Amino acid sequence: KYCLGTVGLLDKCTFRFSQWDPANPNNKYEGTKEQWDEAQRVMGQILDDLDVKYEIGIDEAAFYGPKLDIQYKNVFGKEDTLVTIQIDMLLAQRFGMYYIDENGEKALPYIIHRTSLGCYERTLAYLIEEYAGALPTWMAPEQVRFLPVTDRAADYCADAAKALESQGFRVEVDYRNEKIGKKIRDAQMEKVPYMVVVGDR
């Protein structure tokens, strides 16, 4: 929730607790009913403890365990999964993994698959789509572009750009031999948040 909130997506997402279909357990799911019941109970308890508002999706689980799917709708209204957190009941067994429990016995762990922001490419694509390319300043790959009107202003722009870069800003200088109107138009088309026009005055 923190990561989604940081990039401004939390309020645009819905949470789906994807569970197995107990009426058809042999169709695509592996593991026992007891394993599924326990995994879903634990995941549901965690979500409730964290005050996550979710809807239940029956028959939406992975074949190896329940999951929390964080969904969003793209500009065409199609729902996609942005982030997923999954409980894997099978992987540890297949790799021969175990831990020693409180009784000194070997016990089988469950593996949790998770990411903070899901697939980065998909998240970035959604952000570009959501903001129509005009990303928030803190997220923009280029935050400031200096536009010298004449060659005489280029040295000043270079010094000013270095000063901003030393403070952590992402800065470019447009040194092209083009009219200032074209430089401004190009920066607008490329969604640069801040343009600094520097001339003799």
Model-derived features: positions:
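NTP/phosphate- and nucleic-acid-binding module
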Residues: 1-201
